[in-house]
Regions:
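Active-site-adjacent substrate/metal-binding segments within catalytic domains
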Residues: 26-119
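Aromatic-rich peripheral "rim/lid" segments of glycoside hydrolase catalytic domains that contact
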Residues: 371-379, 389, 400-476, 708-727
Length: 727
């Protein structure tokens, strides 16, 4: 009996040891060292070819980038369910896409769903799989050859390869940017390639190159499958090593090869520019995959991957003389109706530069109310774009990509992502709470073809003039001829103002709002209005074109953070601090550029956008005249209004958290919590004070509600891609 117990224990230990070494550590024995590798995907010249059973045929990647975030979840929570993925894969395929791209190792849920969708599907989806570089390692004081960075990078490539072949287990918490689970589904037959790395930080590239520029060991790499040329920088040689080890690992262990690419973007593009552009954009680094080659042992090939948007960074929009550029461009072919399409021009320059296929692995335009960059040539801006214009803008981008000679593209992105933040609004919010509300002022959250609208089945209010969704319970104040109602959800505060016999074209409506007890004014000198308590914001409804929301001078968040850039002075210097009860109400703007480049001259004056201007229109997605940017609409005696939380200086509405007084010992943004606001309504200027009523409010913490909705752009892209497939 004793021997039996010992034997059983030994067997258990051996099984556990095998499980640990094989599935957790990737240890294996090659029992077929002489078996030749195969591939079903390869490159030839500037094209990609795929063998789907009838031999190699030219293949255009028509892809969609899928993030890992959901409302109420961080991307690193990997909260998307199997049923979500299966539904999305079906919709993506029906749109006409043939490929999806993910950026990092997801939870096993993704791979199980991908396998189930494809296993009996005669027309499967293909996958481009990314390998993320650890944010902490990459943004710390390390060069690219630091063992913690490059060794982790290479190891993650091998783990990812094991995962797509169904031979890996990962523990929860192994890496903040990585999923976990048991990966036992072999999806490799649908994986066409790997995009390794991230949008490289220029300072890391420069630091690496400068540190090792005189060290021959780091200036060249020659591997069995990949090598760097004599023109390669140390950083490019590092990439060659990573790619070589990834290809070697898959070739030896799984006897197959996929395409390999390295992530890139305009900040590290391979070009040099005139000095005034270099100085303005701080263009200091280049990564050129033409300096990385494949040996004859590579059956698949490699391609150049770029994230390129029409507005960032639009170097060519500022070129005074195109003869100054380091590359040849066909300018005449990029004019349309007398306007130079610099996006197409840049794409052509990229495609012409490379002798290998070019895939634009990210392109897109967001539909958020906020805005971060303006495309001065084609109007494909980063934000403040109606959903109905997103589709045509995406089609224009896609056509530019194909006409430039690229081998494929991936549309960014499939779904909106509430957790995202962007540089020109993140100072105003609690960025540890972004997944728990829909911040329409942050454009980065709204690139998706799939929208997550607040409300379990429908939104609490649509700005469409239909007042049937309002009830007596929503009324917060009432007088002889005026009534004001209010409600809110994860994205907006909604108002319904009713004025008997209201003449929209000739009358005004004023809605004062008091949020903070720390400041505000009982008088607005702009409109000669008086209030019975200190007011922080004033909504003025003045026809279709002149309606706006303004903020009391002391509570202007743009001034508190960008006074020097926008106004040319330090607002925290004594004499510049606005009075606590200043009667001046100012327009609400959002910063776009910290400085400007005009005719080659670098101007220190910042560029701003009037985000407090209210847009008239129908905000119901089911309406024929739908405008997703609409802020208000009038129907007879009724005016419906919706105001984004951020315009009211809420840093986290899920917890009713607003900005504290910027000048009362804080010198910037600090949060305070409230449990109510005060609102009022008036339609005339009189000596009487406008009365404000208290409205009790309650946050929702982490319990968000939402429902999915395909944006119009989905159907626009569907018509383009499906028509192309049928032709």
């Amino acid at each position: 009996m004793k021997k039996f117990i010992i034997a059983v224990c030994c067997i258990v230990v051996c099984v556990l040891l095998f499980d640990y070494l094989y599935y957790y550590q990737g240890v294996y024995i090659d029992f077929s060292p002489n078996k030749k590798p195969i591939t079903f995907v390869c490159t030839k010249g500037e094209k990609i070819y795929l063998d789907e059973g009838n031999g190699f045929e030219e293949f255009e990647i028509k892809g969609v980038d899928i993030g890992s975030g959901m409302p109420g979840e961080w991307s690193t929570d990997f909260g998307i369910t199997k049923s979500d993925y299966l539904r999305w894969f079906k919709q993506i395929k029906e749109m006409g896409a043939n490929t999806v791209r993910i950026y990092t190792i997801n939870n096993d849920v993704f791979y199980n769903a991908f396998y189930e969708f494809n296993k009996d599907n005669p027309d499967p989806l293909y996958l481009l799989h990314g390998v993320w570089v650890n944010d902490y390692l990459y943004n710390s004081a390390r060069d690219a050859y630091d063992p913690e960075l490059i060794d982790t990078f290479i190891n993650d490539c091998k783990i990812m390869i094991d995962i797509v072949h169904g031979n890996r287990k990962l523990q929860l918490g192994r890496d903040a940017s990585s999923g976990h689970g048991t990966y036992n589904k072999d999806i490799s037959q649908w994986v066409i390639g790997y995009i390794l790395g991230v949008e490289w930080e220029d300072v890391t590239v420069v630091y690496t190159n400068e540190k090792f520029k005189n060290n021959e060991k780091y200036n060249a790499y020659k591997g069995k499958y990949m090598y760097s040329t004599q023109d390669a920088t140390p950083f490019e040689a590092m990439l060659a090593r990573v790619g070589d080890e990834a290809i070697e690992y898959e070739t030896k262990r799984y006897k197959t090869q996929k395409l390999v690419a390295f992530s890139n973007w305009p900040i590290t593009d391979p070009f040099t520019y005139p000095q005034y552009i270099t100085d303005y954009f701080d263009k200091c680094a280049s990564v050129d995959v033409e300096h990385i080659g494949c040996t004859d042992k590579v059956l698949s090939g490699h391609f150049a991957s770029y994230h390129i948007y029409p507005y960032y960074r639009d170097y060519l929009a500022f070129v005074k003389d195109f003869n100054e550029l380091s590359f040849d461009v066909d300018i005449e072919s990029c004019y349309k109706d007398g306007t130079l399409n610099t996006y197409k021009l840049y794409l052509k320059a990229i495609a012409d530069h490379h002798a290998i296929p070019v895939v634009i692995s990210e392109f897109g335009v967001p539909t958020g109310r906020g805005i971060a960059h303006i495309d001065t040539n084609t109007g494909r801006n980063q934000g403040h774009m109606p959903e109905t214009e997103q589709g045509p803008a995406l089609v224009a981008c896609y056509n530019d990509i194909i006409e430039a000679g690229c081998a494929g593209s991936c549309l960014f992105s499939w779904q909106d992502e509430w957790f995202k933040r962007t540089w020109n609004t993140n100072y105003a919010i609690d960025f540890m709470r972004t997944p728990y509300w829909s911040d329409v002022q942050t454009n980065e959250q709204y690139f998706g073809l799939l929208s997550f609208d607040p409300g379990k089945e429908k939104t609490v209010c649509y700005i469409d003039g239909d007042v049937s969704e309002w009830s007596e319970d929503d009324i917060v104040m009432k007088s002889d001829d005026l009534t004001l109602s209010m409600k809110y959800d994860e994205a907006y505060v909604y108002f319904l103002a009713k004025k008997d016999n209201f003449d929209f074209n000739n009358e005004k409506l004023y809605i004062p709002i008091d949020t903070t007890p720390k400041s505000g004014s009982s008088y607005c000198e702009n409109n000669d209005l008086r209030f019975d308590r200190a007011v922080d914001f004033l909504i003025t409804i003045n026809g279709r074109k002149n309606s706006k929301i303004q903020v009391q001078e002391r509570y202007e968040v743009l001034r508190a953070n960008y006074a020097k850039e926008v106004y040319g002075f330090d607002t925290y210097v004594k004499g510049n601090i606005p009075m606590r009860d200043s009667p001046k109400f100012v327009d609400i703007n959002i910063i776009l550029q910290m400085s400007q480049l005009v005719d080659g001259n670098h101007l220190t004056e910042a560029e701003v956008f009037p985000t407090g201007v209210l847009t008239y229109g129908n905000g119901n997605p089911d309406a024929k005249n739908y405008n997703s940017l609409s802020d208000f609409i009038c129907n007879g005696d009724y005016v419906e209004i919706r105001i984004p939380w951020q315009l009211l200086n809420f840093s986290d509405p899920s917890r009713l958290q607003i900005h504290d007084d910027y000048y009362d010992g804080h010198y910037g943004i600090e949060p305070i919590n409230i449990d109510s606001i005060y609102v009022g309504v008036s339609n005339e200027v009189t000596d009487q004070r406008i009365h404000l009523e208290q409205v009790e409010m309650k946050g929702w913490e982490n319990k968000v509600t939402y429902h999915e909705r395909l944006k119009p752009a989905y159907y626009v892209m569907q018509s383009i891609w499906r028509e192309k497939d049928e032709s």
